[in-house]
Design a protein with these regions (language model features):
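Pocket-edge positions in alpha/beta enzyme catalytic cores
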Residues: 17, 64-67, 154-161
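Conserved alpha-helical substructure of the radical SAM core
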Residues: 59-89
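Short glycine-centered, acidic/aromatic-flanked micro-motifs in structured strand/loop junctions
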Residues: 93
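Short, charged low-complexity linear segments at domain edges
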Residues: 17-40
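Canonical Radical SAM [4Fe-4S] cluster-binding loop centered on the CxxxCxxC motif
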Residues: 34, 38-71
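Extreme N-terminal tail/first-helix region
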Residues: 9-23, 67
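Short, small-residue-biased leader/transition segments that mark boundaries at the very start
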Residues: 1-5
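Conserved AdoMet/S-adenosylmethionine-binding subsite of the radical SAM
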Residues: 76-88, 97-174
């Protein structure tokens, strides 16, 4: 199953962390009151998702080869101007944990005084685990009951990715 993810360009561990400057930023919501309940945040959308859910509301974020629309340096400059005005930063996607620069970006957001939130599907429990000490809140996107993952996320019904995806999401909940 990990070969499926490797073919999609995913590194399964954070052994080779990258700089936040390597992030492919697909969008920035400057002020959100809905992405983290009870908090005023900025939401950063990261490009790339291993799944193609039938009801995806961000289909433009699926292809990890799509270039970003802004550099992390621009995001960081924006966040510096919002210090004391926002409660936090939420990283979302796509699936943000697939980007190796996420760890550094979260550290930088904390260094600026922001709380850090994460929206994830839990598809990469081995990538999520080392991020947990940096995360103040998680919005966990369970796609379906485990038996129905294949019908929601798999592009090829013969693929085992639905079973693997369900198992990984449930493992991430632990």
């Amino acid at each position: 199953a990990s070969d499926v993810y490797k073919r999609q360009g995913v590194h399964l561990t954070h052994r080779q962390l990258a700089s936040a400057d390597s992030l492919t930023v697909a969008g920035l919501v400057r002020l959100s009151t809905v992405d983290w309940p009870g908090h005023m945040v900025s939401t950063i959308f990261l490009q790339g998702c291993p799944w193609n859910c039938v009801y995806c509301h961000n289909p433009d974020l699926i292809d990890c080869r799509t270039p970003g629309i802004m550099a992390w340096a621009d995001v960081e400059t924006f966040l510096r101007r919002r210090q004391g005005l926002l409660d936090g930063v939420v990283f979302t996607g796509g699936e943000p944990t697939r980007q190796r620069g996420l760890h550094d970006a979260m550290e930088r957001a904390h260094a600026l005084g922001f709380q850090v939130g994460l929206h994830t599907m839990g598809v990469y429990p081995t990538l999520l685990r080392p991020l947990l000490p940096l995360i103040d809140w998680v919005g966990f996107d369970i796609k379906a009951a485990p038996a129905h993952y294949s019908s929601i996320i798999a592009t090829d019904p013969r693929s085992s990715i639905g079973t693997v995806g369900s198992r990984h999401a449930m493992e991430s909940l632990d």
